[in-house]
């Protein structure tokens, strides 16, 4: 019976023949999610959510717990792998017009917001210098909200500064949010298979479909194998490549690091935040850098779905990718010229893409009409 169910699930799932490797990142994200939950559970068993013991408990996990170093590194580097996959997944959705499947896109964007919140809470848990100060800076942005800001910040912290109650609730949130992510991922997949996935040409996939198994399962397995290989290579040879040197010191509220910054996968949002000198303006720009993805399905005006046949939008898309990388790089630098100016220019171009999206569609439609 289970074998028959598997056949129904995979064998009879009709999928477009021409979907490329860029469509594999969904299954890779599922694998990353499973690994994060498993490694996270084993870490939670040994972790102590107390400001005096949290840092020591991480040291204990890496030194004394059998294979604890592997669990800790898999969890930390797995998070980076998760974000690499999700950013590629979103880029593919933008490039090939997958956002026109509105319900799937909106549930996916909600998933991204939940994932970013989970990763942020997780970054605070080791209670190192950068964990503490990144948490202080980011949560302090809530004070920019008029009238309610200070009350909300005090409520989130559980006091008048980041302390033991903050760490306890961040651990609780970091533990519970992945279950919400799993539930929403299931909904995301269900909504996707309501209409079926798109394809690189942006045409109706119903014309030419093949069973998911064995054709696409083997293609997925190849990419999964490559991802696991990269992950294990990084864990084995470069385990601290994504770590900040400041985070190897225990949190000290009396000593501020020279340059406070979050993990690399938040640097683009942090760079946009820093490029605006006003606190409320920066906080709004930070929120909009993610929330603006929600508007994309409603600003598509072109008669063509995929960017494969849209040269103007291709140019804009790759400009967006370049600005994303430039903002990420600039955010690692101190807040001084020329990095401030670079961040401001790149942030402006970043938001211009989303304003130009409907305009480029109208231009392309008119060019095709007159030809």
UniProtKB/Swiss-Prot annotation:
Location(s), subcellular: Mitochondrion inner membrane
One GO cellular component term: mitochondrial inner membrane
Entry binding sites for heme b b562: 75, 174
Membrane topology summary: Multi-pass membrane protein
Requisite cofactors: heme b
Official protein name in the record: Cytochrome b
Note accompanying the cofactor annotation: Binds 2 heme b groups non-covalently.
UniProt source species: Eryx miliaris
GO molecular function, one term: metal ion binding
Similarity remark: Belongs to the cytochrome b family.
Listed Pfam families: Cytochrom_B_C, Cytochrome_B
């Amino acid at each position: 019976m289970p074998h028959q169910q598997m056949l129904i699930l995979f064998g009879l799932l009709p999928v477009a023949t021409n979907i490329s490797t860029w469509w594999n990142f969904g299954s890779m994200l599922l694998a990353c999610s499973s690994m994060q939950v498993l490694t996270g559970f084993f870490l939670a068993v040994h972790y102590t959510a107390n400001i005096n013991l949290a840092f020591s408990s991480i040291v204990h996990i890496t030194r004394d717990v059998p294979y604890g170093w592997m669990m800790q590194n898999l969890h930390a580097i797995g998070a980076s792998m998760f974000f690499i996959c999700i950013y590629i997944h979103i880029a593919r959705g933008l490039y090939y017009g997958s956002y026109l499947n509105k319900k799937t896109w909106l549930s996916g964007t909600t998933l991204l917001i939940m994932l970013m919140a989970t990763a942020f809470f997780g970054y605070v848990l080791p209670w190192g210098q950068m964990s503490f100060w990144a948490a202080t800076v980011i949560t302090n942005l809530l004070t920019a909200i008029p009238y309610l800001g200070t009350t909300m910040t005090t409520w989130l912290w559980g006091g008048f500064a980041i302390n033991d109650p903050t760490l306890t609730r961040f651990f609780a949130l970091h533990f519970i949010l992945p279950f919400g992510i799993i539930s929403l991922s299931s909904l995301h997949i269900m909504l996707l298979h309501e209409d079926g996935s798109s394809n690189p040409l942006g045409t109706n996939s119903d014309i030419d479909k093949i069973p998911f198994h064995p054709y696409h399962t083997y293609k997925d397995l190849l990419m999964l194998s490559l991802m696991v290989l990269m992950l294990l290579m990084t864990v084995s040879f470069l385990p601290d490549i994504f770590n900040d040197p400041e985070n190897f010191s225990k949190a000290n509220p009396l000593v501020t690091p020279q340059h406070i910054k979050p993990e690399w996968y938040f640097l683009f949002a942090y760079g946009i935040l820093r490029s605006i000198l006003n606190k409320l303006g920066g906080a709004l720009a930070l929120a909009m850098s993610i929330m603006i993805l929600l508007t994309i399905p409603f600003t598509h005006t072109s008669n063509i779905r995929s960017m494969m046949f849209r040269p103007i939008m291709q140019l804009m898309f790759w400009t967006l990718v370049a600005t994303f990388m430039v903002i990420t790089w600039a955010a690692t630098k101190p807040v001084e010229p020329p990095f401030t100016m670079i961040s401001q220019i790149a942030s402006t171009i970043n938001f211009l893409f989303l304003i130009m999206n409907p305009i480029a569609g109208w231009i392309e439609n008119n060019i095709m009409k007159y030809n």
